[in-house]
Amino acid sequence: MAGQVVQYGRHRKRRNYARISEVLELPNLIEIQTKSYEWFLREGLIEMFRDISPIEDFTGNLSLEFVDYRLGEPKYDLEESKNRDATYAAPLRVKVRLIIKETGEVKEQEVFMGDFPLMTDTGTFVINGAERVIVSQLVRSPSVYFNEKIDKNGRENYDATIIPNRGAWLEYETDAKDVVYVRIDRTRKLPLTVLLRALGFSSDQEIVDLLGDNEYLRNTLEKDGTENTEQALLEIYERLRPGEPPTVENAKSLLYSRFFDPKRYDLASVGRYKTNKKLHLKHRLFNQKLAEPIVNTETGEIVVEEGTVLDRRKIDEIMDVLESNANSEVFELHGSVIDEPVEIQSIKVYVPNDDEGRTTTVIGNAFPDSEVKCITPADIIASMSYFFNLLSGIGYTDDIDHLGNRRLRSVGELLQNQFRIGLSRMERVVRERMSIQDTESITPQQLINIRPVIASIKEFFGSSQLSQFMYQSNPLSDLTHKRRLSALGPGGLTRERAQMEVRDVHYSHYGRMCPIETPEGPNIGLINSLSSYARVNEFGFIETPYRKVDLDTHAITDQIDYLTADEEDSYVVAQANSKLDENGRFMDDEVVCRFRGNNTVMAKEKMDYMDVSPKQVVSAATACIPFLENDDSNRALMGANMQRQAVPLMNPEAPFVGTGMEHVAARDSGAAITAKHRGRVEHVESNEILVRRLVEENGVEHEGELDRYPLAKFKRSNSGTCYNQRPIVAVGDVVEYNEILADGPSMELGEMALGRNVVVGFMTWDGYNYEDAVIMSERLVKDDVYTSIHIEEYESEARDTKLGPEEITRDIPNVSESALKNLDDRGIVYIGAEVKDGDILVGKVTPKGVTELTAEERLLHAIFGEKAREVRDTSLRVPHGAGGIVLDVKVFNREEGDDTLSPGVNQLVRVYIVQKRKIHVGDKMCGRHGNKGVISKIVPEEDMPYLPDGRPIDIMLNPLGVPSRMNIGQVLELHLGMAAKNLGIHVASPVFDGANDDDVWSTIEEAGMARDGKTVLYDGRTGEPFDNRISVGVMYMLKLAHMVDDKLHARSTGPYSLVTQQPLGGKAQFGGQRFGEMEVWALEAYGAAYTLQEILTYKSDDTVGRVKTYEAIVKGENISRPSVPESFRVLMKELQSLGLDVKVMDEQDNEIEMTDVDDDDVVERKVDLQQNDAPETQKEVTD
């Protein structure tokens, strides 16, 4: 028997065909959300208050500091927030200190700064009652970037950009004459040396001494018209502020505020880290030949002699000296923007491949402290040096699509940025109030206006592109939505501008971003998914784990290192399937490995790391596709995406052929209920589980407190499916931490169960499975195999109107008693009622404008005392195709103190209708390999082809769907599934390390099936065997959310467009079907003139004609001739609006009046129309 039996959770054993043992457990799959939010609450908020403190007034007398903060208790708990359409949030209270410097008085106060949304345990937010997910954003990291470009003459050129987190960009570029220019904040370019002079390097000689002599620098100095620091400052000021009178002081303060003011310019810690990494000497001297010795500046000792070529070992040896003070120089700058001395490290090296022995100076930024978030003069000088080095062939350009240069902004950082915007708006208000208020009586509360902070947070959660309504179709869709990475959004790319290169798979995605799972369509490659083992480090770079190879013994160690993409570039990484002996040494002398994106074979001694698992390349959803290695990537993409659209079934079933990921995905998705502590189950019922904690102290286990786990029963999910949890533990069970206690939707025994295992035959059947269509047995309908439950929510509000309040009532004008049979005495439908399209759910009347009563009516009202009820029926009715059973009714009243109702609403009624949808012709089905199709026919069970033992098969698929699509995985799944069913086992075939051909065929033989996996099938209609043996097996098929019930739509009459008077389009608007240009040609070709005429008039925009037609049909009379369509009159008006005098003339050249006809006129003149049906009359009466 191939494979070994592995336990997945408490209830499921699977035969696992993996050959590689798991060295590292999968991390918690939603920690990308939870960890980031925890960081925000722990550090992010404090960091922001620290950045903004203290706020001082313009005189410097008042100072406001933010000391500390605390979060209070949420007003409503999670369930209550969802029920009341409220936000699950806690009050944020900040301790604020006001210091009045004149008197030395200190006032401390706790200030309420709005309700702050809290993250649920499952990584979501509840905003206005709906669950939302904040998607992580993939953006360019702040750093220094060097780019290679070809100019219009075909010459190789370079440009460079210093990109901060916020602040002005600094760009360097060369022109055709080899002059180097700088652009400050996208303005006009200046010679580079102007900026250097402005920094305090006044003379040409100082600049040459600093950067080293080269022709680019000489050309730039010739172009430079300034001669000293003051002139350079004035030149820069004129470029940045044209039209203002330049002074040296103004120029200094402008340059300071652009680059050196922490409030205006921020590299962020990640920018400082990347800049140091790029510009420091230790990263730039690799493989360079020294033209001067490296000296320890403190001791004067020569560390490395001139002429030495620095390899990696040599650099490691002198690392301490390089990081401290090797060849350091300090410049005292006079008349500069910054008063402090500038420290740099500079070393001359020989230009590579140069016969003349020319040298160039490599200048490093002498490692500014990681706390320095601004750019420093040393950074600017070092970046200029790097640029000149590039022109000499030293250094390398950056690949912007490399994941070392792209980072993630997760929830915490996105929230922090948004909060910062609110705080900076608030800061302005505080400053203004400080100058107005009386200092004696002033308090922090009076100074602070929290509106801008609350507004910016609300705006972020409510309308940001990255705050998305959670796609809650099944546990997998929950999970992948939380692990999604988007390159779109504020500060990111836009769909239209994103080029092929950004969207493409990059070698640095390996183990970090899934190469398979991305949407089809305009967002392809811009929205990605995090790989299964990936994690995000403190700087926002994605790391992936590798097993460390011991450099001495060349054996794999137990140490696991997480590497970012640019760290990985320095190492050789072996594949996870490399063969190892019992000591962890590579068995083959040559090992398949990766180095900087090249897949190659190297000697085993050169290995530095090894992959932890074959599935570390792919995301959680892709890792759920068995035999992924046998599928074409395009189809695997569809398979991964379609699993997310599977509808939760009434009786779900875990797959016979899984990958072992089903249990993990179900546990981490948040749809299941998991134990928060180890304990013993004390009580189980359908809506609650009680677990007594077991606590160990001094080696003795004793009982602790009781944990209560409420279960969700038949709730509506965000996508209108049924969200229901079922216990899978029994009283007395001892459960471990994080063990599954209750299955959620689309789960069975603690495993994800998106579909059902059905017997499938690859065969044609009377052409019904043409074009990927699916033929299904009626058994799947009768036995509720693919039946799903759908819950829809409808609401009705009673508001205050100008004419009086609306009223929810059973007393509705002009409605028969039979139409009110399902309503209670309040006028609201009762729970359990079966309702059909058009039935009333909530009776509601709205006051109409009061009309003047006649004398007789006034008398009657005076006698009988009855108020004139001028009301209109505005009841909530069941929309078309949405009938079902009323599951629940919720009523919210303002009188009963429901403060969550929006202004002007007195009463809100919510009705939930549940539908049980069996599978239909027209529903979409799919497998896990991108093999999708629509059901074309449901065949009676007795007519389906049957196996030799008499069992009819469930589904027939077209065999032509396999070869051209190259998703052979489905065929292997089919055979292995049949074997597993016959053996009564479940199997796991992990991706890239699953069952191979031999395993499949040996399992088939073990199950007593034919070696080729095929069988004779008999035609259910005739009993005759089919000519050839047919592949029959068990495949896992899903029912997708694209159901025919949601798409089926018909209209007789309905709403019309205001201007053209043509019917609207689409099911949502209850619109008609467009009869377009080509359809008109078809009728013209047939000569069906009258059919065409009525389509273009009555059925479209002949406003008078359609009223008359309706009346004629009701009365059973002949339909009169059509009048002028509205669109013709619109065309006339449009031409008239252009100043063209357009008139309609008859044959005698008399003008035909195109009159405007009111609805009342139409009614009055209908009689005339029927009496006098002459063509002239028709032309006159138009609308």
UniProtKB/Swiss-Prot annotation:
SUPFAM superfamilies per record: beta and beta-prime subunits of DNA dependent RNA-polymerase
Oligomer status and interactors: The RNAP catalytic core consists of 2 alpha, 1 beta, 1 beta' and 1 omega subunit. When a sigma factor is associated with the core the holoenzyme is formed, which can initiate transcription.
Membrane spanning residue stretches: none
Catalysed reactions, semicolon-separated: RNA(n) + a ribonucleoside 5'-triphosphate = RNA(n+1) + diphosphate
Entry EC number(s): 2.7.7.6
BP-aspect Gene Ontology terms: DNA-templated transcription
HAMAP family, A to Z: RNApol_bact_RpoB
Keyword entries, A-Z: DNA-directed RNA polymerase, Nucleotidyltransferase, Transcription, Transferase
Source organism phylogeny: Bacteria, Bacillati, Bacillota, Bacilli, Bacillales
GO molecular function terms attached to this record: DNA binding; DNA-directed RNA polymerase activity; ribonucleoside binding
Name by which UniProt lists this protein: DNA-directed RNA polymerase subunit beta
Gene name of the record: rpoB
Leader sequence residues: none
Any one cellular-component term (Gene Ontology): DNA-directed RNA polymerase complex
Pfam families hit by this protein: RNA_pol_Rpb2_1 (PF04563), RNA_pol_Rpb2_2 (PF04561), RNA_pol_Rpb2_3 (PF04565), RNA_pol_Rpb2_45 (PF10385), RNA_pol_Rpb2_6 (PF00562), RNA_pol_Rpb2_7 (PF04560)
Its biological purpose: DNA-dependent RNA polymerase catalyzes the transcription of DNA into RNA using the four ribonucleoside triphosphates as substrates.
Family, similarity comment: Belongs to the RNA polymerase beta chain family.
InterPro entries linked: DNA-dir_RNA_pol_bsu_external_1, DNA-dir_RNA_pol_su2, DNA-dir_RNAP_su2_dom, DNA-dir_RNAP_su2_hyb_sf, RNA_pol_bsu_bac, RNA_pol_bsu_CS, RNA_pol_bsu_protrusion, RNA_pol_Rpb2_2
